[in-house]
Design a protein with these regions (language model features):
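Glycine-rich phosphate/diphosphate-binding loop of Rossmann-like nucleotide-binding domains
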Residues: 11-56
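Electropositive phosphate-/nucleotide-binding environments in soluble metabolic enzymes
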Residues: 30, 34, 38, 59-63, ...
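C-terminal binding/interaction regions
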Residues: 94-95, 99-139
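Active-site rim loops that border cofactor/substrate pockets in soluble metabolic enzymes
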Residues: 46-75
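Glycine-rich phosphate-binding loop
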Residues: 64-105
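Short, ordered loop/turn segments at secondary-structure junctions
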Residues: 28, 85-86, 121-125
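Short coil/turn connectors at secondary-structure junctions
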Residues: 18-19, 75-78, 111-117
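N-terminal presequence-like segments and the immediate start of the first folded domain
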Residues: 1-20, 136-139
């Protein structure tokens, strides 16, 4: 299902200059996650979030996003953004990583002290990930 018609209207976002953001980025598939981070920062900057209110940490892969987000929640930020990309391969590894990551982030939302935004692509192909990280479906 295409999400192209559901792009965020950034004009509807309130001024966020007083909010502190923690961003946790997976280094795995960094050609995709770097573009997702760029899009995320563009939205934050366009809504008056100063660079000094943004902390970024990198983790090895999407599985480690949960740990990174937990650490970030402890840094007294207002919101955490988890950025990752899992691309399906030939084994069940994709399913295990996607399930563990999504459930872990859900648990942080239920039990943590601030929301964690799920910006993790779970695509069948590299082409799908490219299309969703600044490609034809935006960022």
């Amino acid at each position: 299902m295409s999400t192209a018609s559901f792009h965020l209207d950034t004009n509807l976002i309130n001024d966020a200059n007083n909010l502190k953001f923690g961003i946790v980025v997976s280094s795995w598939n960094n050609n995709i996650t770097d573009d997702l981070l760029e899009g995320c920062l563009k939205v934050l900057y366009s809504n008056n979030v100063p660079e000094s209110n943004i902390q970024i940490i990198n983790v090895p892969g999407s599985f480690e996003l949960v740990y990174g987000c937990k650490i970030m929640q402890e840094k007294e930020v207002d919101v955490v953004i988890a950025i990752g990309c899992v691309i399906k391969g030939e084994t069940k590894h994709f399913d295990f990583i996607c399930n563990a990551t999504s459930n872990g982030i859900k648990d942080l939302n239920v039990n943590g002290n601030c929301p964690v935004i799920f910006c993790v692509l779970t695509d069948n192909t590299l082409e799908q990930s490219i299309a969703r990280s600044g490609g034809k479906f935006g960022n």
